[in-house]
């Protein structure tokens, strides 16, 4: 059973060691984010030359190595893109497929080796260029990283938005066999959601990514979706009985650290998966 959690986007000093880890699940931390933008006061696109934009002081190479040494069920991934940087939207903005892929392979290989990472997650949410360009760039990138033995798993993080889905479904159609998990952002839906409605959305996304391991999700910030206190775990139990619960992911450790429920729901999710 797989549990995954995004970490590091909010620079509030959250550390890997703050997060409770159940030894009986596969546990993935996902660093948020690496972005192909310049790191400076006004970030601009770099055509595939990625830089770390997560809290590298608290989530450093030595801290990655330490948490993986402590728990042999922990792997660490990095998410590409994200919604915004410095208050501006992050765009997927390649000059050409081949130049973007070459730059991305070399810059990400460096980051992945430096930080002892195991996988990548694709979380672009705004796009310049058409779905086919996105499919080729990302598809070729993940194919090469896997073939070179740089990463052992890949996930994508779409949500229910027409433009987003058209890009990720184009990628899925051509390169779905290279993608191990679909981190579907169910928390982007409205928060006025019943368990039945959630299960309906889940089936809808399973059919959008046929054959994919669609993971369910909740957020610990104030965004939407089905919250733990409103029946999220009831929905999970139903999916588990049906053999459809491939895993759970959470946005985000940063928010949980600051919430009144400090990591309570992370523990609940992991014990449900481990049971």
UniProtKB/Swiss-Prot annotation:
Domain spans labelled GH18: 1-270
Gene Ontology annotations of biological process type: chitin catabolic process; polysaccharide catabolic process
Source superkingdom: Eukaryota
Cleaved signal peptide residues: none
Coiled coil feature spans: none
Function according to Swiss-Prot or TrEMBL: Able to cleave glycolchitin.
Family label: Belongs to the glycosyl hydrolase 18 family. Chitinase class II subfamily.
Protein name per Swiss-Prot or TrEMBL: Chitinase 2
